[in-house]
Amino acid sequence: MKKLTALFLSLLLVLTMTAALAETDITLWTFPIGDWGNSEKVDEMLAAFNAVHPDIKVTVEYLDYTNGDAQITTAIEAKTTPDIVMEGPERLVANWAAAGKMLPLNDLWTDETIADINANNASVVATCQGADGNYYMYPLCMTAHCMVINKTAFEAADAMQYIDQETHTWTTEGFENALRALVNAGYFPTGLIYCSGQGGDQGTRALVTNLYDGRFTNEEHTLYTMDSEANIKGLTKLQELANEGLITFDASINGGEEIALFVNGTSQMAFCWNAAQVANNKDKLADGIELFPMAFPSEDGVPRLDGGVWGFGLFDNGDDEKVAA
C-alpha cells in the first residue's frame, strides 16, 4: 500500500506542482484493478494524500469493463476526459495515446526508474512506451493471467486426476477428459467461452493459443497470427468440445460476466482470472466453491502465460499549467 500510495502521489504532483498555492481539482477515473475498485481503500490513500496536500481535491469515478470504454470514448468526444486514468497499456498506450489524447510522462521515467523496473521485468518498460518513443503510462502493478477451477466440483467428478496439482498445469487431453468427467457427474455448464466485448479477451485468447502452442502475434509484434495452423486447430478443438456438449459458447457475455457466473456457482471454471480477482470476489463466492488457480491447458503441459500490467496515464485536457508540470 505504501508503494502504491507513493507512486500515486507522484502523478498527482506532476499535475499540481505549478499550482501548489491555489486550490486544485483533479479527476481520477479507474477501472476495477485490485483495490482500485474498492472505494474504501482508495479513500484511505486520498486521506493520506490530503493530510499533506489539503488544497488538492481528487474526485474519483469507478469504471467497469462493461461500460468503461464507452464512457471514456464519450468523454473524449465531449472533451471532458479525466486528468488521470488507471488501466493497462492496451488502452493507455495503444489506444488513447496513439490517438493523441494522452500526455507524455517522460519526466517520470528517469534512468533510476527504468533500471528499477527492468530489474523486476524487462518487458514492462516497452509496454509503457508509444510508437513515437514517448512514455504514456507509469506502471504500478502486474500479474500473470490464468484460469481457475472449482476444486470441489472437480474432486466430486474425479477430474483432479487430469491435473498436475503441484504445478497447477494440465495437458489439452487432460482438459478434455476433465470436462467430460464434469459433465458425466452432472456439472454443467463446465466453462463458458465468451465474446460479447473486449473485456477479458486475454482469457479466451490464451485458451486458444495454448491448446496447440500457438501465438497471438509474431515475434516482432507486427502481425497478428490468430489464423495460424496451431490456432485454427485450437479453435476447432473448442468447437468440437462444444458440439459434444462439454463446453459452452455464450456470445452474450464478456469476461467480467463469465467471472460472475463462476463465482455464483453456475459454471465450474473461469478463463478470465488473476490474483486481483481473488480479492475482488472473496465476498461474492458461493458456498462450497474452492478456488484452484490453473494455467491454461497445452499439448505438452507447459503453458505460455501472458502478464497484465496496469498503471496511470494523464489525458491531455489542454490545461497549459498541467502540461507544463
State each model region's role.
Residues A6, A20-A99, D111-I117, Q161, ...:
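Conserved N-terminal structural module of periplasmic/extracytoplasmic solute-binding proteins
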Residues G88-C146, E173, G203, L207-T209, ...:
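Hinge/lid segment of periplasmic solute-binding proteins
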Residues F31, N38, L46, A94, ...:
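Extracytoplasmic/periplasmic substrate-binding proteins
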